[in-house]
A protein has these predicted regions:
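Active-site-adjacent structural elements in enzyme catalytic cores
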Residues: 1-318
Length: 318
């Protein structure tokens, strides 16, 4: 059932139901993070491997590891600085877990991924959970993307319902918060070492992190931490995709696809506004900015699948 009532959504979550909630990145399939049955249902509904960790979403950006109910056990100064600068927002921090963070949430690792979403509806739900059950505060929800595992992430409620409506139980809810503002998943940063390490790229980049922390940012190459959204099957449409490095290369990619047997009208183009669409191809997205590119990308990939596009050429935004 679709609802606009954040308190109804919070009540459902506290009772162990699942709720599709909007965030600024993508829609999430939320379940109470300290409720093992709810976490188990998230994995079952999505068809997600149980070894794959989920992100705990909370309303309070205070990363005090000493307070009762904390999800983390240790917070370095640079992680605290990132939280203060970037939360609420599309940044997930990986930190040493507390006893409250179960193996179901962490994928059996000794770390937990945590963030404060920036969407007002998501924050309203989380705050309502704390108000309705203050003894259990600070509450958190696990909220991986509200889609079948491996499919393109949903940036509108219709996307999520198309994937999950027939998999949810009668007591589960969906909260419509409109289109997602960012449109791609949060940046994930490992904060368990002496320096921050990006484990998954997103809206917040290395330069942003360096500016806040004053530290060089490491890449994920030497990290053994499993994180959400980092498997090869993630975010994949049915169509094949090629990434053209610049607009000048677009025609060559399209020509190669046609020579390989793909009909021109089954080729989809994602490129910045002003980049011409090759003759016969289908334009999927023509954004005016890099932010618009990110915001519209997943919707374009879903439309490609819905319209029978077999091959997509995406020109990198420059």
């Amino acid at each position: 059932m679709i609802t606009a009532d954040s308190r109804a959504a919070a009540t459902a979550l506290l009772e162990g139901a699942l709720v599709i909630i909007p965030t600024e990145t993508v829609y999430g399939l939320a379940g109470r993070a300290d409720h093992p049955d709810a976490i188990g249902r998230i994995y079952a509904v999505k068809g997600r491997p149980s070894s794959h960790p989920v992100i705990v979403h909370v309303a309070d950006p205070d990363l005090d590891a000493s307070r009762p109910g904390a999800w983390v056990s240790d917070v370095p100064d640079y992680a605290r600085a990132l939280a203060q600068a970037c939360w609420p927002g599309p940044l997930t921090l990986v930190l040493p877990r507390s006893d409250r963070a179960s193996d179901a949430v962490t994928g059996g690792q000794d770390t937990v991924a945590i963030r404060v979403p920036a969407h007002p509806d998501a924050l309203a739900v989380l705050r309502a959970m704390d108000e309705l059950d203050p003894a259990g505060a600070p509450h958190g929800v696990a909220a991986p993307s509200a889609n079948v595992f491996g499919h393109v992430s949903p940036t509108a409620l219709d996307h999520a319902r198309a994937d999950l409506a027939d998999r949810l139980a009668p007591g589960d809810l969906a909260l419509d918060g409109g289109p997602c503002e960012v449109g791609v998943e949060s940046t994930i940063v490992d904060c368990t070492g002496a320096q921050p390490r990006i484990l998954r790229p997103g809206r917040i980049g290395a330069a942003d992190i360096e500016r806040v922390t004053g530290m060089a940012v490491l890449d994920a190459s030497s990290s053994g931490i499993r994180v959400p959204g980092a498997m090869p099957s993630h975010y994949a449409p049915a169509a094949s995709i090629a990434l053209a490095p610049d607009p000048a290369a677009l025609e060559a990619y399209v020509d190669a696809a046609i020579v390989g047997g793909t009909q021109a009208d089954a080729i989809g183009i994602i490129a910045m506004e002003g980049v011409p669409t090759p003759e016969g191809a289908t334009r999927l997205l023509a954004p005016a900015s890099a932010d618009d590119y990110a915001r519209g990308l997943y919707d374009a990939l879903r439309r490609a699948d819905a319209t029978g596009i077999a091959f997509i050429v995406a020109v990198a935004p420059v």
